[in-house]
Amino acid sequence: DCGRPTVDAAVMRSYVLAAAEQGYPVRIHTIGDAAIHAALDIFEEARAKFGPLPEGRRNCLEHLENFLPEDLDRLAELQVVAAVQPPHMTLDPGGPERDLGPERVRFMWPFRTLLDRSTVLAFGTDSPVVDVNSMDVLYSAVSRRDPGTHEPAGGWLPDERIGMAEALRAYTQGSAAAAGRRRELGTLEVGKLADLAVLDRNLLACDADDIQKTKVLATFMGGTCVFER
């Protein structure tokens, strides 16, 4: 059972091709492997017809919960951003194994595999589906454990854990790429917006169990302090 497409594939194809002809990227909501595969086929056709999108613009897929193994390489090949929400992976403990079986579960939320294939990951919270706390996102990504229960011990599919530096990159540069705003956001550089948060600890040096204890000391937008503890 592949579920029901919200938008008919032929209609989606017409939207993507029309956008590609004008040089515009498209973001598609794709949860399961059938949706991901269909969207990548459309992006591939658009690229063949009209060439790569202009510099700084990338198509994006949202959620990408379980993959067909043959699609794992295609995101990087087609320069598609994978916008994912790490806390989703533990919303239904035991559910993936029950519904999909052990073979298909191996390709669920495969962050390590995607990064090893040079895919651009973009992190977000997907609030209100999960909590808006960004530290929960980082905790889930590096531990593969639920931010509320801290289960399972050792992490779910622990081989797909990523490092904190990689998680921060996904939450900054990756998210800027998903928004098509890498010239303005994602890194601290001359000429970009000075949007940043000051934290009470170095996330690159702290233990995974301490990530969620992090407090924001100050927030700056455009170089202006808009919050201070």
Question: Each predicted region: which residue ranges?
Answer:
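His/Asp/Glu-enriched, well-ordered alpha-helical/loop segment
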Residues: L17-R27, A34-N59, L64, P69-D73, ...
